């Protein structure tokens, strides 16, 4: 989707887009994505694209986020003909391109003289050996979610925009066991939910070959596990517990997570799946690192080489 780098922009653009092209008639365009049912903007995009492309129906294949790498890879290797696949991690598109599953986009971009400037230099993340295999779909940064209801009940001040990781850990331990608060914090099972905080100093890079900076964050998470201030990684992986399920139980005080979760949380509260006051603040930071520092996640979209509607799929990608 063109210039969709945040949830707000995604929804705003699809609601304001006018019809500018006629698409194939009576065609179903299938998109494989994760957590469609808990991500409201997918429905908004479906409705907007269908409204501007009469005769086209968008159909989603919903895959649980924790099963994405295995499920999506199995579908592609099995010859699945779904038209579009979301790209959760850069390693996805690198593998899929090398395995011949991704349709090269370079010729489509050249044919339409498609302007890539709106991606502000992010599109090379999805290129391999000079060929573009996917385009950015969404970009998000990480924040700290917190349960205001639990903090209010405990009489403890909310987390702030200028809080060190040591202060965060102390606050998590303080909140643990107070009233209905069972856990002071929550770490999801993704690698990024631990190690990516190390890049917030603007110096360390995950591509540098040295990973000493990560140890601090591993040790911090393990210390919180040992203090029973967060759910244990082994228990989370065994149960397959989604981060939204963990936070929405209402017994967790804080959770570092991407900004995309805002729309899901609002929607789930609206639908009665949870009921508490909540807020967001900047991620904690290490001593000497500027307050408000964060890191981002990029989500991409690619055309399946087995798609039978490649031109229409490109129209969706470039829309």
Which residues fall in each region the model found?
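Hinge/lid segment of periplasmic solute-binding proteins
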Residues: 88-141, 275-282
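Short, polar/charged alpha-helical segment
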Residues: 36-57
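Short, well-ordered beta-strand elements
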Residues: 25-36, 56-61, 83-84, 133, ...
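Short helix-initiation/N-cap motifs at beta->coil->alpha
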Residues: 62-71, 88-91, 163-169, 234-248
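Glycine-centered hinge/linker elements that transmit conformational signals in sensory
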Residues: 172, 206-237, 283
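Short, low-complexity disordered leader/linker segments with a strong preference
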Residues: 1-30, 51
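Extracytoplasmic/periplasmic substrate-recognition and gating elements
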Residues: 51, 57, 154, 269-319
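A structural signal for short loop-to-beta-strand junctions that line the ligand-binding cleft
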Residues: 75, 82-83, 112-150, 182-184, ...
